[in-house]
From Swiss-Prot:
Interacts with CtaB. Belongs to the COX15/CtaA family. Type 2 subfamily. It comes from Erythrobacter litoralis (strain HTCC2594). HAMAP family: HemeA_synth_type2. The keyword Disulfide bond does not apply. One of its GO terms (cellular component) is plasma membrane. This is Heme A synthase. GO terms for molecular function: metal ion binding; oxidoreductase activity, acting on NAD(P)H, heme protein as acceptor. It is found in: Cell membrane. One of its GO terms (biological process) is heme A biosynthetic process. Pathway: Porphyrin-containing compound metabolism; heme A biosynthesis; heme A from heme O: step 1/1.
Length: 337
């Protein structure tokens, strides 16, 4: 049971860093630190000259030259965006240590059950990979004329974090069940779980692209978009480019694919209800809140804290989906036995 509690704590930290990552993106803070220093980067600049040096590095980015600079950014404003990127990176280091040190302790004491060492190592590899992927994302906006990081790399960074979150939750649930039933075997992923997960994956991918392309600003009305229902996509470069780059089309797809996700999640919630009523309620509550916050984000013209709450609820939706999928997978195994 101690291992399960530990993984729940790490999962809570991942939810927190997802929210902080949302703030970092929405405040345009991601390119404020233009280098990656694993050790020396732990501390922020401690003198005015050090702050000025960091600001000078940021002023070389396309974001500053084309957006922040013309908007009149000064050193005080730079310190604000620097804080969020620095905090995001620090929290990433905390997550790494919060996973590695207890894992080593449990490993040395022989407390990790058979069959789980490889899974825990895979989760730790995902955590390390997140750090590398985060820098790979930032690097896409450094030394170029881009005013934002690549939305493809941004989506990979977010989706990997949420995959890690689901893995932590799933493993914690397996370990909790094992502590209660010594001969329990890991839950399996069922067909309905695959269906709901794939549809939710597409919705989160679209949401990440919307965030990365600032496509939330394409329309501030709902359900219509700027007076119309269907978008008029930019097809000058073909449909593939439009489906991956056109802000208006991606905004449209994100807001309406959400209803496909709702249907899939309702099916999942109904399937799990006989086995775990709380998981069913969690799924319904999470997607209901997600939809309301998504609409509120649009109508508020992408208010920072509403948009952050929308992303935070997305992480909670991933947790509730993993919980429901695990409950169904556990019940199916029990029935088969």
């Amino acid at each position: 049971m101690a291992l399960a509690r530990w993984l729940w704590v790490v999962a809570g930290l991942v939810v927190t860093i997802v929210a902080i990552g949302g703030i970092t993106r929405l405040t345009e803070s991601g390119l404020s630190i233009t280098h990656w220093s694993v050790v020396s980067g732990i501390l922020p600049p401690l003198s005015e000259s050090a702050w000025q040096a960091e600001f000078d590095l940021y002023r070389q980015t396309g974001e500053y030259r084309l957006e922040s600079g013309p908007a009149g950014m000064d050193l005080a404003a730079f310190k604000f965006i620097y804080f969020w990127e620095w905090f995001h990176r620090i929290l990433g280091r905390v997550i790494g240590l919060a996973f590695l040190l207890p894992m080593m302790w449990f490993w040395i004491r022989g407390m990790i059950p058979a069959g789980y060492r490889g899974r825990l190592l895979a989760l730790f590899a995902l955590i390390c990979g997140q750090g590398a992927l985060g820098w790979y994302m930032v690097a896409s906006g450094v030394g170029t004329d881009l005013t934002d990081v690549s939305h493809f790399r941004l989506s990979a960074h977010l989706l990997t974090a949420l995959f890690l979150l689901a893995g932590l939750v799933w493993t914690a649930l397996d370990l909790r069940r094992l502590a209660r039933v010594p001969d329990a075997r890991p839950a399996r992923f069922t067909g309905v779980a695959w269906m709901a997960s794939i549809i939710l994956f597409i919705q989160i991918l679209l949401g990440a692209w919307v965030a990365g392309l600032n496509a939330g600003h394409a329309s501030y009305s709902w359900p219509m978009m700027n007076g119309g229902l269907l978008p008029q996509p930019d097809l000058t470069r073909g449909w593939l480019w439009a489906l991956t780059h056109d802000p208006f089309l991606l905004h449209f797809l994100h807001r309406w694919w959400a209803w496909v996700a709702v249907i899939a999640l309702v099916v999942l919630a109904r399937k799990v209800r006989p086995f775990d009523r709380r998981a069913s309620i969690a799924v319904h509550s999470a997607f209901g809140t997600m939809v309301v916050l998504g609409i509120a984000t649009v109508l508020s013209e992408v208010s920072l804290w509403i948009a952050v709450a929308h992303q935070l609820t997305g992480a909670l939706l991933v947790i509730s989906t993993a919980w429901a999928a695990h409950a169904i997978g556990t019940a199916r195994k029990t029935e088969a036995a």
